[in-house]
């Protein structure tokens, strides 16, 4: 992000897309050197295939998919509009990239120290905490009087809520879904989250175009409160 912001500020924005294309080519070259993994198609696997999607009938799983739909949609929307909010508050593009860089470091610290709290609290408690963090973050963005408040909020809260929810997702899915279906269940949630991101990006764009980014953040805070209620 830091490099992309520097490119946008000091060179041509088109150079960003060229760099992404080069990175993609390098990734493809790297994968060419890996070994293929062979999968065996046994009769036992075929017999179990019919039960692979039985989790779709589990009420707890369906509820979690809905909760994830709300959370991921707002989280992705925040990733798009929080840098724009900082620019509206007067920050240059390069400084915005620096803030995003350090907020990612905070995310890494949450991951590294997750062992201290992930097994000490229930999934519901952790999920409520993630929603509470997002509500506080969105309300602070919506009411930020200057860039300083928004920057501090971004550094402290931007990555914590989303990272925490991602870790909770795996914990809860493993608790409500049979072991053989965990990967499929996570895949369904991932697809749902992708649809949520597309829908929320469109709705968010319409709302910002007709009102303001601050109104958008008030709306997202309301959706996160709805998610908290569903979690209860």
Predicted feature locations:
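A membrane-interface helix-boundary motif in multi-pass transporters
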Residues: 6-22, 206-224
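Helix-to-loop junctions at the C-terminal end of transmembrane segments
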Residues: 8, 110-122, 208
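C-terminal membrane-cytosol helix-exit motif in multi-pass small-molecule transporters
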Residues: 21-40, 230-232
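Juxtamembrane intracellular "pre-TM" segments in multi-pass secondary transporters
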Residues: 35-64
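Extracytoplasmic gate region of multi-pass secondary transporters
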Residues: 61-98
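Structural signature of the two symmetry-related core transmembrane helices
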Residues: 125-140
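Intracellular juxtamembrane helix-capping segments at the cytosolic ends
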Residues: 164-177
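A late C-terminal transmembrane helix in Major Facilitator Superfamily
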Residues: 181-210
């Amino acid at each position: 992000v830091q490099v992309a912001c520097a490119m946008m500020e000091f060179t041509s924005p088109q150079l960003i897309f060229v760099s992404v294309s080069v990175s993609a080519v390098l990734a493809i070259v790297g994968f060419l050197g890996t070994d293929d993994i062979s999968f065996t198609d046994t009769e036992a696997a075929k017999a179990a295939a019919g039960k692979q999607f039985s989790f779709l009938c589990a009420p707890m799983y369906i509820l979690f998919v809905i909760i994830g739909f709300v959370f991921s949609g707002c989280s992705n929307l925040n990733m798009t509009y929080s840098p724009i909010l900082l620019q509206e508050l007067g920050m240059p593009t390069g400084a915005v990239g620096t803030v995003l860089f350090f907020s990612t470091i905070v995310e890494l610290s949450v991951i590294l120290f997750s062992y201290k709290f992930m097994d000490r609290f229930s999934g519901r408690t952790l999920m409520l905490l993630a929603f509470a963090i997002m509500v506080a973050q969105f309300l602070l963005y919506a009411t930020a009087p200057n860039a300083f408040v928004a920057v501090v909020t971004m550094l402290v809260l931007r990555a914590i809520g989303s990272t925490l929810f991602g870790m909770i997702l795996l914990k809860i899915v493993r608790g409500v879904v049979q072991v053989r279906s965990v990967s499929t269940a996570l895949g369904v949630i991932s697809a749902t989250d992708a649809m949520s991101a597309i829908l929320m990006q469109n709705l968010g764009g319409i709302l910002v175009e007709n009102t303001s980014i601050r109104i958008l953040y008030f709306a997202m805070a309301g959706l996160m409160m709805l998610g908290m209620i569903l979690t209860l």
